[in-house]
């Protein structure tokens, strides 16, 4: 019997909050990073609502609305491939594979982001489903 384990990538495997907060602090200053992160959390679902934007476009538009200068509106998209996994994740994923589990990612991002993050994780996945390719962001039913 094949056993599958599915994961969200960002916030589960990759430290999304840490990565985005560091970049927001770089762009807006550490004193404003938490407020900008809270505002980002409000903006993201609105920007994903129709399912037609790539995640790169979501990140860029969010930064524009947060007031980033033109030169930094793509800062989150540029930095995302470098965001680190949570420390315990690579070993846990490898253990799951060693025990016969097949690994899959369901993500609200784009293929290039997932491929970069999978490389950082250092453990192969059998499958990755990304929002832009299916025209749906979680938690919409179409994503499942």
State where each predicted segment sits:
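N-terminal helical cap/lid subdomain that shapes the substrate entry/recognition surface
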Residues: 2-91, 99, 110
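Structured helix-beta-strand junction loops
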Residues: 43, 99-100, 124, 131
């Amino acid at each position: 019997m094949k056993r599958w384990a599915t994961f969200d990538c960002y916030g589960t495997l990759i430290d999304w909050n840490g990565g985005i907060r560091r970049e927001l602090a770089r762009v807006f200053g550490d004193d404003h990073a938490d407020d900008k992160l809270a505002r980002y959390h409000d903006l993201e679902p609105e920007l994903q609502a129709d399912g037609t934007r790539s995640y790169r476009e979501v990140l860029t538009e969010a930064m524009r609305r947060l007031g980033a200068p033109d030169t930094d509106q793509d800062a989150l998209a540029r930095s995302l491939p470098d965001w680190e996994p949570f420390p315990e994740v690579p070993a846990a994923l490898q253990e799951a594979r060693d025990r016969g589990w097949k690994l899959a990612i369901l993500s609200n991002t784009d293929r290039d982001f997932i491929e970069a993050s999978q490389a950082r994780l250092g453990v192969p996945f059998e499958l990755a489903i990304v929002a832009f390719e299916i025209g749906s962001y979680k938690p919409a039913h179409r994503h499942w």
